[in-house]
Every structure is written in C-alpha cells, then in structure tokens.
Amino acid sequence: MDVVSLDKPFMYFEEIDNELDYEPESANEVAKKLPYQGQLKLLLGELFFLSKLQRHGILDGATVVYIGSAPGTHIRYLRDHFYNLGVIIKWMLIDGRHHDPILNGLRDVTLVTRFVDEEYLRSIKKQLHPSKIILISDVRSKRGGNEPSTADLLSNYALQNVMISILNPVASSLKWRCPFPDQWIKDFYIPHGNKMLQPFAPSYSAEMRLLSIYTGENMRLTRVTKSDAVNYEKKMYYLNKIVRNKVVINFDYPNQEYDYFHMYFMLRTVYCNKTFPTTKAKILFLQQSIFRFLNIPTTSTEKVSHEPIQRKISSKDSMSKNRNSKRSVRGNK
C-alpha cells in the first residue's frame, strides 16, 4: 500500500477533488473483506447520522422508521448506544425478510415483516401521528443478476421519494447509487441532501448515503442526468482505486489504512456516556466496542514498506492526479 499525508478524509461526494476512468483489470483484483463488513458499513454511517441529529436536538423523542432493515444485526448496537445515553427513541423496523433474533423482545423496537407500498406508508403515518419520524431506507431490488439493474434503481428511488412525501420525516438517510452511464435509461429526481461517503464499503462500490434534514418546507428535488452519472462514475472510481488504497502516514492510530482514517473522523462526532483523556482514546473505545459486537478482529496496518516514524503533522495531499482509462465502475453494496 502507498502512503500519503492527509488533513481529513473525504466525508461527502462533493469533496472528492479528482476523477479517474475505470481500468478493466480492476475487476480481477481480490478484494479485502472484513467479517460482517456490510453491517459495519451501515452501523458507522447510521451512528454518524443519528449523532448529527442528536447534536441538533432532533433525535430525542423521535421514531426511527427503518425500511429495508433486515437482518439489522447492527441496529441492536445503535439502539443500545442511544438507550444508554438516555436518548428516548422508538424503532420501527420494516422488511419483507426476517430480522436477526437479537432484536426480539425489546419494548422500544417494533419488527414488521412485509414490504412497503404507498398504502402501507399512509397507515404508518397515521399510526405514528403526531410523533416526529426519522426515516432510514436501505431498500434494494434485484430482479436478476448480482446487482440491481437501472430499472431496479429507478423503482427504488421512486419509492424513496414516496416515503418522504407521505411520512414527512424531520430527517432522512436514503440509499443512493447513481446508475452507470452505459446503462442509462432516463433522467430522474432525488431529494436534495448531502451525499455521505461510506468507510468499509466494498472495494469498488459507488454507493453512498443521501442525508437530509427538513425544516418544514416542501421536499426539494434534484434532477440527475447522464452527465451527472459520468461524474459519479469517475469520482467514485478515483476514490476507490487511489484514495482508499492509501495508508495515512500522519494518522496516529493502530491501523493507518484510509478506511480507518475515515472511520476515525466519523466516530469523533459520536457522544459517549464516559469521559476520555483524548479524542483518540474515545475513538479506540468506540471502535473496539463496535468490532467486538460484530465479531470483527482488530488489525494493524499491513504492507507498508519503509514506514517512517508516525508524526502528528498535517501536510498536503500527495495523491497523484489525472489517471485515465475507460469503463464503468461496478459495485453497489
């Protein structure tokens, strides 16, 4: 792995400052994968999102409606974390598949085994009135093949728009991956929001989370065009191929790989009911508790040649620019 000095990770898509065309040989690479990596990705993103709402005074007293939540193993960690902080939240977890039994028997968690449609969304809104709703969506349709088709994605995004329109949440975190330009069908609309990047996503995933806080006005929509799709493809490939394969040498942490650096900046925003001498100590505590919960082994930085002594400095981003080749990014998890 190559080394780099960075002040901070790319937290949102708009911050990515370079692009790269796809190199076909990347499809043959053997991807590194942690146990329960998908649950880790979701847990970190949702902990960051909900902690942001907590900081803004939005979370306490809300009902989290999570559509597409199964198996939901990681949700037990989220529930326990905020419960132990004294934050009052109710959880409604909805999926056509069954949830992890670890979520059974909790008074503040309602499990619903069914898929949603417009009629059911209206019944949820009526049932929860006048509670404030926080919406999390991880809906995913695959009518064939290993990844959703563009038609699947457009159907999912239309459903997510209906969720927002009917449930009228105070905030939402939606699944978002732009269709690939070589599979383009038509322009479409998504809610306006911040496009949060995800540490520990699969190696060439182009998926992110669309985060929005609503302040009473009607939902704002953003049009997505084929030109946007080209931009998403190139920037996400640059992030995955170049940035995420770096070791951040000025990052004083047991594992200096970029995804851990990204995780560090997400976890530093999280509240704890303990005090710590340093931010690093808090984040080590949180990481260890998360990894222990998900049965993920703790690892150190690997394959760094001639590593200099760690130093707490900020330096310029030394990543190279303007690489070129051609093909679509593939990876949507």
Swiss-Prot record:
<feature type="compositionally biased region" description="Basic residues">
    <location>
        <begin position="323"/>
        <end position="333"/>
    </location>
</feature>
<feature type="binding site">
    <location>
        <position position="68"/>
    </location>
    <ligand>
        <name>S-adenosyl-L-methionine</name>
    </ligand>
</feature>
<feature type="binding site">
    <location>
        <position position="233"/>
    </location>
    <ligand>
        <name>mRNA</name>
    </ligand>
</feature>
<protein>
    <recommendedName>
        <fullName>Cap-specific mRNA (nucleoside-2'-O-)-methyltransferase</fullName>
        <ecNumber>2.1.1.57</ecNumber>
    </recommendedName>
</protein>
<comment type="function">
    <text>Displays methyltransferase, positive regulation of the poly(A) polymerase and transcription elongation activities. Involved in the modification of both mRNA ends and in intermediate and late gene positive transcription elongation. At the mRNAs 5' end, methylates the ribose 2' OH group of the first transcribed nucleotide, thereby producing a 2'-O-methylpurine cap. At the 3' end, functions as a processivity factor which stimulates the activity of the viral poly(A) polymerase OPG063 that creates mRNA's poly(A) tail.</text>
</comment>
<dbReference type="InterPro" id="IPR025804">
    <property type="entry name" value="Pox/kineto_cap_MeTfrase"/>
</dbReference>
<dbReference type="GO" id="GO:0006370">
    <property type="term" value="P:7-methylguanosine mRNA capping"/>
</dbReference>
<feature type="region of interest" description="Disordered">
    <location>
        <begin position="305"/>
        <end position="333"/>
    </location>
</feature>
<feature type="region of interest" description="Binding to NPH-I">
    <location>
        <begin position="169"/>
        <end position="249"/>
    </location>
</feature>
<dbReference type="InterPro" id="IPR030375">
    <property type="entry name" value="Poxvir_cap_MeTfrase"/>
</dbReference>
<feature type="binding site">
    <location>
        <position position="72"/>
    </location>
    <ligand>
        <name>S-adenosyl-L-methionine</name>
    </ligand>
</feature>
<dbReference type="GO" id="GO:0044423">
    <property type="term" value="C:virion component"/>
</dbReference>
<dbReference type="GO" id="GO:0004483">
    <property type="term" value="F:mRNA (nucleoside-2'-O-)-methyltransferase activity"/>
</dbReference>
<feature type="binding site">
    <location>
        <begin position="177"/>
        <end position="180"/>
    </location>
    <ligand>
        <name>mRNA</name>
    </ligand>
</feature>
<dbReference type="InterPro" id="IPR029063">
    <property type="entry name" value="SAM-dependent_MTases_sf"/>
</dbReference>
<comment type="similarity">
    <text>Belongs to the class I-like SAM-binding methyltransferase superfamily. Poxvirus/kinetoplastid 2'-O-MTase family.</text>
</comment>
<feature type="binding site">
    <location>
        <position position="39"/>
    </location>
    <ligand>
        <name>S-adenosyl-L-methionine</name>
    </ligand>
</feature>
<feature type="active site" description="For methyltransferase activity">
    <location>
        <position position="175"/>
    </location>
</feature>
<keyword id="KW-0946">Virion</keyword>
<dbReference type="GO" id="GO:0031440">
    <property type="term" value="P:regulation of mRNA 3'-end processing"/>
</dbReference>
<keyword id="KW-0507">mRNA processing</keyword>
<feature type="binding site">
    <location>
        <begin position="205"/>
        <end position="207"/>
    </location>
    <ligand>
        <name>mRNA</name>
    </ligand>
</feature>
<keyword id="KW-0489">Methyltransferase</keyword>
<dbReference type="InterPro" id="IPR000176">
    <property type="entry name" value="mRNA_MeTrfase-like"/>
</dbReference>
<dbReference type="Pfam" id="PF01358">
    <property type="entry name" value="PARP_regulatory"/>
</dbReference>
<feature type="binding site">
    <location>
        <position position="95"/>
    </location>
    <ligand>
        <name>S-adenosyl-L-methionine</name>
    </ligand>
</feature>
<feature type="binding site">
    <location>
        <position position="116"/>
    </location>
    <ligand>
        <name>S-adenosyl-L-methionine</name>
    </ligand>
</feature>
<keyword id="KW-0251">Elongation factor</keyword>
<feature type="binding site">
    <location>
        <position position="138"/>
    </location>
    <ligand>
        <name>S-adenosyl-L-methionine</name>
    </ligand>
</feature>
<keyword id="KW-0648">Protein biosynthesis</keyword>
<feature type="binding site">
    <location>
        <position position="97"/>
    </location>
    <ligand>
        <name>S-adenosyl-L-methionine</name>
    </ligand>
</feature>
<dbReference type="GO" id="GO:0032259">
    <property type="term" value="P:methylation"/>
</dbReference>
<feature type="compositionally biased region" description="Basic and acidic residues">
    <location>
        <begin position="305"/>
        <end position="320"/>
    </location>
</feature>
<keyword id="KW-0949">S-adenosyl-L-methionine</keyword>
<feature type="binding site">
    <location>
        <position position="182"/>
    </location>
    <ligand>
        <name>mRNA</name>
    </ligand>
</feature>
<comment type="subunit">
    <text>Interacts with poly(A) polymerase catalytic subunit OPG063. Interacts with OPG109 and OPG123; these interactions might help linking transcription to capping and polyadenylation.</text>
</comment>
<feature type="binding site">
    <location>
        <position position="22"/>
    </location>
    <ligand>
        <name>mRNA</name>
    </ligand>
</feature>
<keyword id="KW-0506">mRNA capping</keyword>
<feature type="binding site">
    <location>
        <position position="66"/>
    </location>
    <ligand>
        <name>S-adenosyl-L-methionine</name>
    </ligand>
</feature>
<keyword id="KW-0808">Transferase</keyword>
